[in-house]
Amino acid sequence: VGLRSLGALIGAVIAGSGLVAMQLPLVLRVNPPTVIPATTVSAPQALVTAAAWPAHGSAALYIPQLGVDQTFNNTVAPIASITKMMTAYVTLQKLPLSVGQTGPCLTVNQVGVSTYDAMKATQQSSVAVAVGERLCENQLVAGLLVHSASNFAVMLASLVAGSVPAFVAEMNTDALALGMTHTHYDDVSGFSAASVSTADDQAHLAAILMRNPVFASDVSMTTLSLPVAGTVTTFTPDLGSYGVIGVKSGRTEVAGGCDVMAVAATYQGHPIVVYAVVLGQ
C-alpha cells in the first residue's frame, strides 16, 4: 500500500467508524495479518493531514507500527458500551484465559434473571438468561464483546471481584496504571453517563487489548452461540470485511454513537493495524 492509498484508508476508517453499525466505506480491501511485528516503520505526518475528521464529537487515530497518534477535539465524554473494553481487560488480567479454555463458571440465579429483565426494560443491550443456566468466563467475555451484553458485565464483576463496586474500583486502578489519565469508570457497562474517557485513551486501550489472543478472537466473531439466548450477533460495523478485525461500538442517548475500530492493512510491505475511535456521533 502506498502513501496515497494508506492515507485514503485512514480517512475512510475515521469516516466509517463514525457511522456506528452502518456500512464502512473503505476504499481498500485488505486481509488481516496473523502477526503484527514489534518493529516500527516511520511514516510522514502528511499521511494523516487529509484525514476526514467528524463534524462533531471527538476522534482519534492510532497506528502503533507507524508512530501515528492523532486526535481531534480530544475531550472527556461519555463512552457508552466502549466501557466494556475495560471490563474485559480487568477480567482477563484477574482471571487469565488461553484460547480454548473455559475459565471459572457460575450458575445463573433469580438475581441474574431479574438483572436481565431490568436491563431489557431500560433498553440496555443484554443477553437472555435462565435460572440454572451454566455460563463460564469464556462465554461471558465473548457475550460481553460480541453482543455487548450488559448483564454479562455484571456477572463478570461478581465472578472476578465479588461485587460491581469492587470491580469498578479495579477498572479505575487499571486505567491509571495504563496511563489513561482522562478516563473514569462509574459502572461496568457504560450505561452510566459518568463513565467517561477520551478517544485517544480508548484507542490506546484497544491496541493493548488486541495483543491478548482471547480478546482478539472474541472481537473478531460475528456471531456467538449461548445456551439459552441461542445465536447472538455482533454490533461492530463490517466486521470480517475490508480488513475490519474489531473491536467495540456503543450508543446511549447521552453519549451518542461511539465506535472503536481496528483495521488490518499493510504499508510498504509491513503489516499494520489502524485504530480509529469516534465519540459523540
Segments from the language model and where they lie:
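A mature extracytoplasmic/lumenal domain signature
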Residues: I63-Q65, T83, Q110-G112, V131-E133, ...
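Short, solvent-exposed loop/turn elements at domain surfaces
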Residues: V68-T71, T115-D117
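Short, well-structured active-site flanking segments
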Residues: Q93-G112, P213-M221
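Short glycine/serine- and small hydrophobic-enriched flexible loop segments
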Residues: Y89-L97, S158-A161, A207-I208
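Second-shell loop/turn segments in exported
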Residues: Q70-P78, Q124-V131, Q139-G143, V154-G162, ...
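Active-site SXXK
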Residues: P78-L106, Q202
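Conserved catalytic neighborhood of penicillin-recognizing serine enzymes
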Residues: V113-A153, T231-V247, R251
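Penicillin-recognizing serine hydrolase domain
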Residues: G2-V68, S163-Q281
